[in-house]
Design a protein with these regions (language model features):
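Glycine-rich phosphate/pyrophosphate-binding beta-alpha loops
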Residues: 58-65
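Short, electropositive alpha-helical surface patch
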Residues: 180-193
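C-terminal helix-cap and adjacent tail motif
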Residues: 2-23, 113, 191-222
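Glycine/small-residue-rich phosphate/adenosyl-binding loop
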Residues: 67, 73-151
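Short alpha-helical scaffolding segments that buttress acidic/His motifs in well-ordered protein cores
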Residues: 31, 53-57, 196
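Small-aliphatic-rich amphipathic alpha-helix that forms the alpha element of a beta-alpha
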Residues: 34, 55-58, 126, 132-183
Length: 222
């Protein structure tokens, strides 16, 4: 077992309290403008923007610092078409057979169905995989810990980074998602966590009229 090695926390920045309050409010005001979008433009997005946002996600905390995620960025039209075809096949079964009535009723205000044109229209599909274990070149395996929690945190940071860059996003989770590992050639140690669709919203994009819970409903101070 290796001994831990530490270094000074030189990256930390201390701000005056007034500036901290200002920064927190400005960040809040920006983040609450974020909306899930299903109508995307095919307008190109520079690859560097996507790379920077993924690097932000890659800086997320994780269980034992194992960083159990892999971001597969899909730009190729043929691959996007394959993903759309497979996703719509699963979604058709979901809406017609698999989903219980309560789930369909919960989805109704969002106006969703089995048709997923955004999977081909948006310039980028970021397919996020969760790694249950890592594998070295010699075949030895290392178990990962708190995988869902770690990948969830990284995904949230990615969504926020993309919003900060001026892009819209959609989290898409067709069920089941085994086809993604097959299409994208990922290992048996990985499972698809979700598809993050990103790009510019179309000029005609609309979002559902829905409400978030109040601060008091989701927060308790002791």
């Amino acid at each position: 077992m290796a001994d831990p090695v530490f270094e000074p926390h030189s990256g930390y920045r201390q701000y005056p309290l007034e500036e901290m309050q200002k920064r927190s409010k400005e960040f809040l005001d920006d983040v609450v403008r974020r909306r899930t979008v299903r109508d995307f433009s095919d307008r190109p997005v520079p690859k560097e923007i996507i790379e920077n946002c993924i690097k932000t996600a890659g800086s997320a905390p994780s269980g034992a610092n194992h960083q159990p995620w892999h971001f597969t960025v899909v730009m190729d039209p043929n691959t996007k078409a394959d993903i759309r075809k497979a996703a719509e096949e699963e979604e058709k079964l979901l809406y017609s057979e698999r989903a219980p009535k309560e789930w369909l009723e919960a989805l109704a205000p969002l106006g969703t169905d089995e048709n997923k044109p955004f999977l081909e229209i948006a310039p980028y599909l970021i397919v996020i995989f969760a790694e249950s274990y890592s594998q070295d070149e010699d075949g030895s395996k290392t178990k990962n810990y708190y995988v869902s929690e770690s990948v969830g945190i990284a995904t949230g940071m990615l969504i926020t980074a993309l919003h900060n860059a001026g892009l819209a996003t959609l989290t898409h989770t067709p069920s089941p998602m085994n086809f993604l590992r097959r299409i994208l050639g990922r290992g048996k140690n990985e499972r698809a966590f979700l598809i993050l669709v990103t790009g510019f919203p179309s000029e005609e994009a609309k979002v559902p009229v829905i409400e978030k819970k109040s601060f008091e409903e989701y927060t308790t101070f002791f």
